[in-house]
Amino acid sequence: MCPMRPRRFYFVLLTVYLAACSPSTAERPWADQIAFDRAEKDRSFRERPESPLPPDRKGTFTSLSYFAIDESYRVPASLVVAPEDARAIVKMPTSTGQMRDMVRVGRLAFTLKGQALQLSAFVEAGESRVDRLFVPFSDLTTGRESYAGGRYLDLTRSPSGVYDLDFNRAYHPYCFYNATYDCPYPPPENRLPVAVRAGERLPD
């Protein structure tokens, strides 16, 4: 689960509406599923009470802005897991000036656009279960074509250690839409030296 919080520190579940409303991904081709999930997220932002949009923006909201769906930004990644007794605590600054303690579970190794790259995967300190991994990142679009505070990926823990790293599912944290949310910024180790033109982007 991505660790975005309202300032009153309740947890936010970003993807619950997709799990509840979406049929199995096996029922649709990959690109169609991405398009469907984007439409569902747009609808959630417009209609659901847990939408991060302030009330004065809901009435004019139509859809989020996305890069075109591009399968070249969907790559396999291998997670090199750190031993439990050697997992580092990384202090991440947040959008409200706080510090968040995150545990580095391991590093995802993958190749994107011909470059061998790595991203660290985290869980929030104190989490008793490690069934979802939080992967915040920045890249060469950050602050230009995408939010200056970076973007996030959420991964369901894979027993095999191999992950479907799909940057078409990269999303902006809630603090991009509403300053009352407290969102961690990606650490320096997760700055990618490539432009990831996939997933959510800034409006034109």
Language-model-detected regions and their locations in the chain:
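N-terminal secretory signal peptides
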Residues: 33-107
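C-terminal motif of bacterial Sec signal peptides marking the signal peptidase cleavage site
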Residues: 18-20
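Acidic, glycine-rich flexible loop segments
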Residues: 135-171
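Bacterial signal peptide processing site
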Residues: 22-24
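Mid-length scaffold segments of soluble, non-membrane domains
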Residues: 83-148
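Low-complexity, intrinsically disordered Gly/Pro/Thr-rich segments
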Residues: 170-185
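Acidic/polar low-complexity flexible segments
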Residues: 181-204
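Bacterial N-terminal signal peptides that target proteins for export
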Residues: 2-11
